[in-house]
């Protein structure tokens, strides 16, 4: 009870940052606070054919199960106070990752390429799946405004990832999904895909 009360007062946060030049996006940070307030910032080209590097920012509300899982895994990882890197040789680089726990006094961060600690692996996968959802939202917003013919292929990819449990916090993309689903100027198959994805959002 005391720990929960202290957490509620300080509203700590957990952040995940990835820096991976040449990937899409090449940089992003997700921050989730104990009260559920979350932010996502990324930088990189919109897609594989885009040459321009753009910044993207979105605020969203993390679902209670996700934020509880994030803080539970953070506690299991000792709030990142130790060395998270596996130090295994001959591992391909998958980007520099940094996890940060900030309780309002002194942030604690640890960086790694690959960790063999299960809580860290699970946090990494969860944050990467959240980034996938938010990057879909980014592209869908752009295509809806400027390139509606690209919506079908993008939503099909999104469906496939959702079916394979490769997306997290789908509700963060709900505004644009509902906008597409409710727009009679969009072809029916695209509207149906968007509607189907909104139906996957946990209530």
PLM region descriptions:
Residues 17-42:
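N-terminal targeting signals for Sec/Tat export/insertion, comprising classic cleavable signal peptides
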Residues 13-18, 42-43, 59, 75, ...:
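Mature extracytoplasmic or organellar-lumen-exposed domains after removal of signal/transit peptides
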Residues 40-58, 157-160, 174-178:
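Acidic/histidine-rich, surface-exposed loop or edge segments in extracytoplasmic proteins
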Residues 4-22, 83-203:
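Short, well-ordered, aromatic-rich surface patches in folded extracellular/luminal domains
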Residues 64-88:
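Charged, amphipathic alpha-helical segments
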Residues 56-61, 110-112:
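A short, exposed loop/beta-hairpin motif centered on an aromatic-Gly-Thr core
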Residues 35, 61-69, 101-107:
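A short, structured loop/turn motif at beta-sheet edges
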Residues 38-52, 128-140:
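A short, surface-exposed interaction/processing loop segment used at functional sites
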């Amino acid at each position: 009870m005391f720990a929960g009360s202290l957490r509620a007062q300080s509203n700590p946060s957990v952040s995940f940052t990835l820096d991976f030049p040449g990937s899409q996006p090449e940089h992003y940070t997700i921050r989730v606070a104990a009260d559920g307030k979350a932010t996502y910032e990324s930088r990189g080209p919109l897609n594989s054919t885009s040459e321009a590097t753009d910044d993207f920012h979105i605020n969203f509300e993390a679902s209670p199960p996700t934020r509880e899982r994030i803080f539970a895994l953070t506690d299991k990882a000792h709030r990142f106070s130790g060395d998270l890197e596996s130090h295994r040789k001959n591992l391909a680089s998958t980007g520099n990752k940094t996890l940060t726990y900030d309780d309002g006094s002194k942030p604690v961060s640890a960086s790694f390429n690959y960790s063999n600690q299960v809580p860290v692996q699970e946090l990494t996968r969860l944050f990467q799946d959240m980034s996938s959802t938010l990057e879909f939202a980014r592209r869908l917003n752009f295509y809806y405004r400027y390139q509606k013919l690209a919506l079908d292929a993008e939503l099909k990819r999104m469906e496939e990832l959702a079916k394979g449990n490769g997306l997290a916090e789908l509700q963060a993309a709900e505004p644009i999904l509902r906008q597409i689903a409710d727009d009679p100027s969009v072809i029916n198959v695209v509207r149906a895909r968007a509607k189907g994805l909104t139906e996957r959002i946990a209530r």
